[in-house]
């Protein structure tokens, strides 16, 4: 495996292998006062973000540093990108400096795949990891979500996962649909008609406009933020009406099955898609997702940079 650009590029065995590796990193770090492994000592990782990020960027940085790599953050707003430098020239510059991996978030779908072609022609050059490209893919988010579901519920096969909210603009949805259906889950997308993707009839999912008809027999309820920064029109009448129809209220949370877990890729809009109290409820796995994000990204970085046959510890 040279790059991680899309969940669709991974086989079922690839997915399970990365999840298992994430669990091994978590176990290796348990109880350590100093979270440091020599796994990627002497390696250089660049993070290149053209969009804002808290969880993904800091998680990748932490993952690299916990494996003793040198991690260098490049912000598009404070680099030569601001002067008009192209993505191609930025990527080639980082490659020439000596990058072993480039972790990139970009506002354009397909940008990570294009970068990989530029910096690693013929498979020679740094690995590229897609940290989110437009509304296309966010593969490490789907991997960490699967790791979290497996930790909470055991096997993913046969589980019902309901994803509620702005599915139209969400790269998380697309990656999770690819991954969860590959592992045998039933996936249901719920949202207003204006926030469900065109062509959804061809996806391996069911979809519904009625949240209450789907969530009460679900094993996982995953809430999504309304991505207002990607909207240029009226996708729903008011925030209050949206919260009434598609928000996870305290009343709805009480009616869920006892074992059902609530997830959210973040950032959360408390009071809109999720109630303030529900966001902090014991069944809500948001912070576990964040923790698993570090271990999952350690697994990805290790696999791509050191190689699948290398020893991690």
UniProtKB/Swiss-Prot annotation:
Pathway: Pyrimidine metabolism; UMP biosynthesis via de novo pathway; (S)-dihydroorotate from bicarbonate: step 2/3. L-aspartate binds at residues 83, 171, 225. InterPro entries: Asp/Orn_carbamoyltranf_P-bd (IPR006132), Asp/Orn_carbamoylTrfase (IPR006130), Asp/Orn_carbamoylTrfase_sf (IPR036901), Asp_carbamoyltransf (IPR002082), Asp_carbamoyltransf_Asp/Orn-bd (IPR006131). One of its GO terms (biological process) is amino acid metabolic process. It is an enzyme of class 2 (transferase). Its EC number is 2.1.3.2. It holds the Pfam family OTCace. SUPFAM superfamilies: Aspartate/ornithine carbamoyltransferase. GO terms for cellular component: cytosol. Gene3D superfamilies: Aspartate/ornithine carbamoyltransferase. One of its GO terms (molecular function) is amino acid binding. Keywords: Pyrimidine biosynthesis, Transferase. Carbamoyl phosphate binds at residues 55-56, 105, 138, 141, 266-267. It catalyses: carbamoyl phosphate + L-aspartate = N-carbamoyl-L-aspartate + phosphate + H(+). PANTHER family: ASPARTATE CARBAMOYLTRANSFERASE, ORNITHINE CARBAMOYLTRANSFERASE, MITOCHONDRIAL. Catalyzes the condensation of carbamoyl phosphate and aspartate to form carbamoyl aspartate and inorganic phosphate, the committed step in the de novo pyrimidine nucleotide biosynthesis pathway. Belongs to the aspartate/ornithine carbamoyltransferase superfamily. ATCase family. Heterododecamer (2C3:3R2) of six catalytic PyrB chains organized as two trimers (C3), and six regulatory PyrI chains organized as three dimers (R2). This is Aspartate carbamoyltransferase catalytic subunit. The gene is pyrB.
């Amino acid at each position: 495996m040279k790059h991680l650009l899309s969940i669709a590029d991974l086989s079922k065995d690839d997915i399970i292998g990365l999840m298992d590796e994430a669990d091994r990193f978590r176990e290796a770090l348990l109880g350590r006062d100093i979270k440091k492994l020599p796994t990627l000592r002497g390696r250089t990782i660049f993070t290149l973000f053209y969009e804002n990020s808290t969880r993904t960027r800091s998680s990748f940085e932490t993952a690299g540093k916990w494996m003793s790599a040198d991690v260098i953050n490049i912000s598009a707003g404070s680099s030569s990108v601001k002067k008009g430098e192209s993505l191609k020239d930025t990527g080639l510059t980082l490659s020439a400096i000596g990058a072993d991996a480039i972790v990139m978030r970009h506002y354009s779908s397909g940008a990570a795949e294009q970068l990989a072609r530029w910096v690693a022609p013929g498979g020679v050059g740094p690995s590229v990891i897609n940290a989110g490209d437009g509304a296309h893919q966010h593969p490490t988010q789907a991997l960490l979500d699967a790791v979290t579901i497996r930790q909470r519920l055991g096997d993913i096969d046969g589980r019902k996962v309901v994803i509620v909210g702005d599915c139209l603009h969400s790269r998380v949805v697309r990656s999770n649909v690819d991954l969860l259906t590959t592992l045998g889950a039933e996936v249901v997308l719920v949202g207003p008609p204006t926030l469900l993707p065109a062509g959804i009839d061809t996806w391996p999912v069911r979809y519904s406009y009625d949240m209450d008809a789907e969530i009460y027999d679900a094993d996982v309820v995953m809430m999504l933020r309304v991505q207002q920064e990607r909207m240029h029109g009226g996708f729903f009448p008011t925030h209050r009406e949206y919260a009434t129809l598609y928000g996870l209220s305290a009343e709805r949370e009480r009616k869920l099955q006892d074992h059902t877990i609530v997830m959210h890729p973040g950032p959360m809009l408390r009071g809109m898609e999720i109630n303030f109290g529900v966001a902090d409820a014991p069944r809500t796995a948001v912070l576990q997702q964040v923790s698993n994000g570090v271990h999952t990204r350690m697994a990805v970085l290790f696999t791509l940079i050191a190689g699948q046959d290398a020893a991690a510890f």
